[in-house]
């Protein structure tokens, strides 16, 4: 019997002659968690698609051995039958089906040729209880539950398929801290029961906590496989990016000028519960060249606030907005962009990109009028602008006419940033600008933010990552339960002080 549950040997994969994977090795023992690390575009997702059967045997080179025998999977059914189950970053839930129906999708229990819903609900409830998940009603539609709960339902679905190896691709990117803790504890329990895990995450603190071994790949090549006990987070970062990064936040001096943007008494109401305020009488000012961070707990009202300022909050709103001292009316994103206010949204996949359109068109769609004459687009002029943006933001793409969905998350995010920078905004709103982005791409995005501030652009940034807020902001607003809880200059500001304000201590205005 082989020492390893899984061995991937010398795996190679090409797309149109371009090598996406070149000689990758990955080994996993039963009961072991292997952290798979690499920048966006390094080849992690491609490697997992090879392993999970998305790319069938024959479309790639190398060998896969499972439980000591060569595995030649022709599709996902083969790998799942063997016990290899992948949970993608984008959850594969059917929102209007019940929890039980999602767990048993494709393998529903039947009696007399008909689905036995009583048996299905009972088995689903039993499965969740076995996983110590006691606050989910299996009869309710999945859309009733948060992203964190849906992630747990996906895991229950995998366990129902008798998974021996669980592949988790960025499982906590949209989870709260408490939901993340539940997930990590669950994975630790699985390890004790002998289940293996491949854990892909840009959150290296999570990788360090649950991984026994770390494999790093860069530009499609295997860089190293080492025990986590021999590594530090800076070691992993150095292997990922190919250089030492002493300071993740490349702060650069920039002048802060007069007030550019002001919001007065902004209130917004819940779409589903119109009597409930999600933003409650918030006022603040933003200066020219200033980076203003917005911190707070998940659900505090941060996204609702900035969405209202960009004209995309679907519920009722009231208040006043001033730009360069003059009151402006923003009812739609078109109004905002015309006034010089642009926004990078929180959910890139849903709100930021047109997935089947080319990378280049996703960049220029905000300024097509620049390349239009009598209703016709000057393709040559547009292509020049696209190529300039690709170079400026270091977007990795073989061809700007490829569908943007084919790019890694970090490169998609750079394209979204480009789309919102091309209109030359006076105010740029960034809602979770580095969510799902690797450490190298984060560094490049931070440099870009500082460069924009030096040019006089006013930056309003929402982030759930406290080190990010404190690392790049000149000033920090704290929102809690829809209210402004604090306004702090970022001088000796600590995470503890921000969190204390977020959970309801009296607001402090020190700006």
From Swiss-Prot:
It is an enzyme of class 7 (translocase). Its EC number is 7.5.2.10. PROSITE patterns: ABC_TRANSPORTER_1, ABC_TRANSPORTER_2, XYLG. ATP binds at residues 38-45. It holds the Pfam family ABC_tran. SMART domains: AAA (SM00382). Keywords: ATP-binding, Cell inner membrane, Cell membrane, Membrane, Nucleotide-binding, Repeat, Sugar transport, Translocase, Transport. One of its GO terms (cellular component) is plasma membrane. GO terms for molecular function: ABC-type D-xylose transporter activity; ATP binding; ATP hydrolysis activity. It is found in: Cell inner membrane. It comes from the Bacteria. It catalyses: D-xylose(out) + ATP + H2O = D-xylose(in) + ADP + phosphate + H(+). Belongs to the ABC transporter superfamily. Xylose importer (TC 3.A.1.2.4) family. Part of the ABC transporter complex XylFGH involved in xylose import. Responsible for energy coupling to the transport system. The complex is composed of two ATP-binding proteins (XylG), two transmembrane proteins (XylH) and a solute-binding protein (XylF). This is Xylose import ATP-binding protein XylG. It comes from Brucella abortus (strain 2308).
